[in-house]
């Protein structure tokens, strides 16, 4: 009789421990990866943006080398986003949108916490200067002036 009672008690404790283990998510399940945290930051940028189109992750800088694995401590992030063809009012996820040809590119920096439940995002994004477009325009402009300089003697570029 004593053995049966101990057996029932052990069975109840085992059941309670099993239920408790299933009810409480593990700490590793609550931590986001660096990339997942950045994708959340991009989503937040799109939600708060007044831009006409959605932006999508273009390039992600490598995560900083840190020993601290605590998901509640802010981690620095740096990444670039590019304008897509999808309007901001669309319900389509930005990751499913194609990049817009000659779309704006923005550099984003800030901090994120990797906690999936209480994650905090503090990121700002600024438009990158379009150096490539300016160089192409300048070359075409110089070429045009070289063609016109014999016709108009006042126009001479060195």
UniProtKB/Swiss-Prot annotation:
Q: Which residues form the propeptide?
A: 30-131
Q: Which domain of life is it from?
A: Eukaryota
User: Which N-terminal stretch is annotated as signal sequence?
Assistant: 1-29
Q: Quote the subcellular location field of this record.
A: Secreted
Cellular component terms (Gene Ontology): extracellular space
Main subcellular localization, coarse class? secreted
Kindly provide the name given to this protein in its UniProt entry: Cathelicidin-6
Species: Bos taurus (Bovine)
Q: What is the lineage of its organism?
A: Eukaryota, Metazoa, Chordata, Craniata, Vertebrata
Gene name of this polypeptide? CATHL6
């Amino acid at each position: 009789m004593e053995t049966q009672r101990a057996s029932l008690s052990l069975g109840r404790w085992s059941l309670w421990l099993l239920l408790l283990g299933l009810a409480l998510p593990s700490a590793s399940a609550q931590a986001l990866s660096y990339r997942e945290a950045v994708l959340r930051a991009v989503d937040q940028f799109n939600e708060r943006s007044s831009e006409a189109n959605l932006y999508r992750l273009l390039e992600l800088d490598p995560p900083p080398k840190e020993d601290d694995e605590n998901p509640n401590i802010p981690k620095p992030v740096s990444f670039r986003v590019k304008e897509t063809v999808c309007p901001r009012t669309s319900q389509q996820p930005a990751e499913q949108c194609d990049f817009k040809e000659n779309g704006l590119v923005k550099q984003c920096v800030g901090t994120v916490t990797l906690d999936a439940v209480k994650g905090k995002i503090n990121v700002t994004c600024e438009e990158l200067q379009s150096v490539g477009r300016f160089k192409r325009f300048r070359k075409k402009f110089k070429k045009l002036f070289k063609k016109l300089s014999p016709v108009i003697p006042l126009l001479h570029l060195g």
